[in-house]
Amino acid sequence: MNIFEHSIKNVDKGNVVAIVGTQWGDEGKGKIIDILSKYSDITCRFNGGGNAGHTICVGNKKHALHLLPCGVLYENNINILGNCMVIHLKTLMKEINNLGNNILDRIYISEKAHILFDIHQEIDAIQETRKSKDGNAIGTTKKGIGPCYSTKASRIGIRMGSLRNFENFKKLYIKLIDNLMDLYNIKDYNKEEELNEFYTYHKILKDKIINIISYINKSIDSKKYILIEGANAAMLDIDLGTYPFVTSSSTTLGGIFSGLGIHHKKLNLVVGVVKSYLTRVGSGPFLTEQCNEIGEYLTKKGFEYGTTTNRPRRCGWLDLPMLFYVKYINCIDIINLTKLDVLSGLKEIYVCVDYKNKTTGELLERGSYPLEDEQLREYEPVYEKFEGWDEDITNCIEFDELPENAKKYVLTIESYIKTPIVWVGVGPTRDNTITRKFD
């Protein structure tokens, strides 16, 4: 389905579609982004850094992307790394080199994106070690994301635009690194070696660093199709997620406008990606977590191991109150439900439909969400039970081919969140996706 032509048929707006994760990440955004990239002219990433990861399965080959947008897999697609990203250039160049085929010709990097240095990763590990001693570790990927955003917020960070003039970059670099070494008592850091690496990056990338705001808006005005891919997910948003167990950037709809510099009226469709069950990496509250054989089953069958860290993900039942809250804050228009096939073989499936206060027995108002850890501990999940199914659904290509219990599961989710589920993922590849009609 060409979602761009479908979505703008009766809407006098821009040709812009956004994909956002609705949970704690790892929902399977990469696959739907990959599918839709076929129809887009430009694919944009607006936030985050190498802590995110998309795994794209094309035939028997897997592509793990941490910084590059998924559009790089299509030769007709321009790919943009946005303003609010933090970019570890060693990681970026590794991804570019792994893909080959003149990928660099189709990549542009915002001059406003911040550079993530190796010292940011060292600081991340130092901070996490200190927190773990007090039992307050966040469970970060140790990719340096938080420290890089910290230097950005402190206005001492270095932006990609500075790399175009290497002599000026060198002065900024020495000042920043000396500052951070002193602040964190880092005695041994090879500045000369890193500067040599960055001189290479300067020569390779200086013409790829541009004003993306102008580029994207001119593209929208000329009726190009723009696909926006979110990294991480809504419940990891620095402001709207389960703080402090969040990432360091805005992962929700609002982050798009600063991350790419486009007007909100230019955005005409928001796709929310929902996994059929729930997972989380690292620390933080998780009301529906299953620390039992069900959790182990979901981890193994769903191959729930982090793209970035390879850590096993915590697994549990789908949480609809959370999903309803995320729909509110992202203005989600349609849903892509993923990994329904993982639930095949379970005799019973549970879905959280309400949060009940442990003391008063009152149910949480739909659309609100207690984001603080201590607030969440006041509630317990209220479940609805569904009968499972044994059939292998990976070869289903139409919704009506699904077992009745699987269809009931999907339709119940759709009814609860009052948002059409357009795509249903029934396996790992592009072809394992059921497309339903929507108005």
UniProtKB/Swiss-Prot annotation:
Pfam families: Adenylsucc_synt. The keyword RNA-binding does not apply. It is found in: Cytoplasm. Keywords: Cytoplasm, GTP-binding, Ligase, Magnesium, Metal-binding, Nucleotide-binding, Purine biosynthesis. IMP binds at residues 26-29, 51-54, 141, 155, 232, 247, 311. Pathway: Purine metabolism; AMP biosynthesis via de novo pathway; AMP from IMP: step 1/2. GO terms for cellular component: cytoplasm. Its EC number is 6.3.4.4. Parasitic protozoa lack the de novo purine biosynthesis pathway and rely exclusively on the salvage pathway for their purine nucleotide requirements. Plays an important role in the salvage pathway for purine nucleotide biosynthesis. Catalyzes the first committed step in the biosynthesis of AMP from IMP. This is Adenylosuccinate synthetase. It comes from Plasmodium yoelii yoelii.
